Amino acid sequence: MMNKICLYLPLFFSSLTMANEPVERVISLAPHATEIAYAAGLGDKLIAVSEMSDYPKEAGELEKVSNYQGIKLERIIALQPDLVIAWPAGNPAKELEKLKQFGVPIYYSTTGTLEDIANNIEQLSQYSDDPSKGQKAARDFREELTALKAKYNTTEKVRYFYQLSEKPIITVAGKNWPSEVFNFCGGENVFANTAAPYPQVSIEQVITRQPEVLFTSRHAMSDDGMWAQWKNELPALRNNHVWSLNSDWINRPTPRTLNAIIEVCEHFESVKRKR
């Protein structure tokens, strides 16, 4: 279960193993990396992607060479890519090392901040035929972030709980993705200080922390009524502050994260207006 969840939650940092020059055959090994590749102007160079790469629509038509269980090492080598966009937090380290041993150039993408989304687009754009496309996408992303920061009041905090899965109940802690999206909007994570990056928690622990807002997503719950019996114990339920987020927007650090920010910030603003 945790491996499946991690497919949506990449950690963002990047490193390059080759000189920046245009490439012709690109493989992406994570859904967020696929979206970043398109934004960077490499969409027409992609020849294979990860199993859950479904955006943009064209990505869904490409050959699938990885999933939460691992990567198809022999197939990737046979495709002779001149750039693989890898995700160290989700792709097996031993398999990535084997790709390197076969001389496959790898761009490593892991997570950190919203700014890293723009940085990764810029870096990958250097491998496209027209780097200006990716540079513009990165610039537009930064400008929209600035506009959103000016629009929403983030000084007044809202205590929230974000549910990543149902059985077991898993959430996010610390600065791990997508915590920064919620922080951007003035959110205060009720499990922020938990040691594990994606801790398993109990219903009782959630109730004890009394979140004002409870966020889920379509990937998080099969039973929409799992919290209903706790309405009297949870402020979020008593005040109808339970919302389902678009999991692709919120869990993948890509240009579409801007949509997640708007979604989360609007929910928080509605809570503040009722105070």
UniProtKB/Swiss-Prot annotation:
The record marks 74, 204 as: Important for BtuC binding. The keyword Membrane does not apply. Its main location: periplasm. One of its GO terms (biological process) is cellular response to iron ion. HAMAP family: BtuF (MF_01000). Belongs to the BtuF family. The complex is composed of two ATP-binding proteins (BtuD), two transmembrane proteins (BtuC) and a solute-binding protein (BtuF). Part of the ABC transporter complex BtuCDF involved in vitamin B12 import. Binds vitamin B12 and delivers it to the periplasmic surface of BtuC. This is Vitamin B12-binding protein. It comes from Vibrio parahaemolyticus serotype O3:K6 (strain RIMD 2210633).
